[in-house]
A protein has these predicted regions:
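Glycine-rich phosphate/dinucleotide-binding loop and adjoining beta-alpha-beta core of small-molecule
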Residues: 2-176
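Glycine-rich phosphate/pyrophosphate-binding beta-alpha loops
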Residues: 179-181
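Short, small-residue alpha-helix embedded
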Residues: 106-109, 183-199
Length: 199
């Protein structure tokens, strides 16, 4: 495990996990966003973390052919919580986003607005968390379509939408989960577990 983040958190990580490596270096996967404040929350640590995450996520942005090759060569990354609003417009499938309904609504609103502007289309009705809860599969599929990312939508039924090795859409649904997964912080644990599996 390698940790890169604020010094006060580094000390807590080392106290709990002395074998953790602190600082930059080689990784097999990234997990970003857990514990990172959203853009609307100000603070020096949060700003520094967000700047670092934004710089990392730029490497995953799809664009020109050279940029695409570089993006596909990057290790898998899990983008959670406070980093979801930093997601580039188009990313490859090894980018996994893990929003809950409220975060998904914000993400869909951002990307639908960008798509409407690019296509000179009429603007869409804003999504709400309730819209996502009422149509979770359609929401997850739309997020995948707009971003290219593999989408893991957290909820009563966890929905994963991505593509298989041949580029075909793949959907996995799981309604089996322990009750503790509905408590605050369990999404951070999920992101960490997913990052470990992707490594």
């Amino acid at each position: 495990v390698r940790y890169l983040g604020p010094e006060r958190a580094q000390n807590m990580v080392l106290a709990a996990l002395p074998e953790a490596v602190i600082g930059k270096g080689h990784v097999q996967s990234w997990v970003v966003g857990s514990g990172v404040p959203e853009a609307s929350v100000e603070g020096t640590d949060g700003d520094m973390q967000r700047d670092t995450i934004a710089a990392l996520l730029k490497h995953y942005a799809l664009g020109s052919e050279d940029e695409n090759k570089d993006a596909y060569d990057m290790p898998p990354i899990v983008v959670d919580a406070g980093a979801l609003d930093l997601l580039p417009e188009r990313v490859p499938g090894q980018v996994v986003i893990t929003p809950h309904a409220g975060e998904m609504a914000k993400l869909l609103n951002r990307f639908e607005t960008a798509a409407s502007t690019a296509e000179h289309a009429d603007s869409h009705e804003p999504y709400t968390a309730d819209d996502v809860r009422l149509n979770p599969l359609a929401s997850a599929k739309r997020a995948h379509e707009l971003t290219g990312a593999t989408v893991l939508l957290k909820g009563a039924v966890t929905m994963v939408v991505g593509t298989d090795g041949e580029g075909n859409e793949r959907v996995i649904l799981s309604g089996r989960a322990p009750a503790w997964m509905s408590t605050a912080g369990s999404g951070d644990v999920l992101a960490g577990m997913l990052g470990a599996l992707l490594a």
